[in-house]
């Protein structure tokens, strides 16, 4: 809880393109089974059927390199990962 969330430039609105090794480093922000979205938040269905939180359509992720709430070590990685703002 309190960990930084990121967006991935290679995703498309409503679609996650981060799987396998990518998802190992950038774990998706998975919604609880009974979650309901509202406002700018929505749910994106991943290939495995899991529901992932999205902001303005863009799927949200954590960065495995962040160890404490407020860490932003993933910001700018590869030029394609950005802190949710």
For every predicted segment, state its role.
Residues 1-85:
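Compact beta-sheet-dominated domain cores in extracellular/mature segments
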